Amino acid sequence: MIQILKNPQTESYIKAKEVALSGTLPLHWIPSDTGLFYYSHTLIARPEFLYYSHPVSAHADLFVAAIGETLNANDLADNGFHVIRASINVVHPSKGEQFSEPHVDHSFPHVNLLMYFTDVGGRTFCEKEEHDPQEDDVILFKGEHYMERPKRDRRVILVSTLQIY
């Protein structure tokens, strides 16, 4: 189930959004066998590579603060949370493949939290539901999911996986 969260638009969120949309954030091209390439800035590296999550960006603390403030504003993190991985993903419109492969991010229990920094479309699908994002939307879900390319401009989002206690 996709849960739409209240975005408190805290100072951390506003600064994080500015960083994500800046022209100075280093982005890395991520190729795909299916043709749906994208650009990414890893904030917290996934544990599957080194067996533990670890920050790899100077901006990690800012984005974790924005995540925590959003969870707290929605009464979801009374006992804390753990960010498993986080990155800024940027997808441009393009001809060819329009949908990513359906996938689950980890083989252990987790939820996904997405923050949408642009208003260009690019739906997110989870199980049998879909979310057509607006700028500043925040959603929480678990399960198999995939995304659609935007039809115009660049789709910039925070992608994170969490364990909430």
Report the location of each language-model feature.
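Short beta-strand His + acidic residue motifs that chelate non-heme Fe in jelly-roll/DSBH
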Residues: 100-103, 146-153
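A short glycine-rich, His/Asp/Glu-containing loop-to-beta-strand
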Residues: 73-95
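Non-heme Fe(II)/2-oxoglutarate
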Residues: 1-81
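A short beta-strand-loop-beta hairpin characteristic of the jelly-roll/cupin
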Residues: 96-101, 108, 116-134
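A short hydrophobic beta-strand segment most commonly corresponding to one strand
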Residues: 113-115, 153-165
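Short beta-strand segments enriched in hydrophobic/aromatic residues
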Residues: 92, 117, 143, 162-164
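Conserved metal-binding segment of the jelly-roll/cupin
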Residues: 93, 131-146
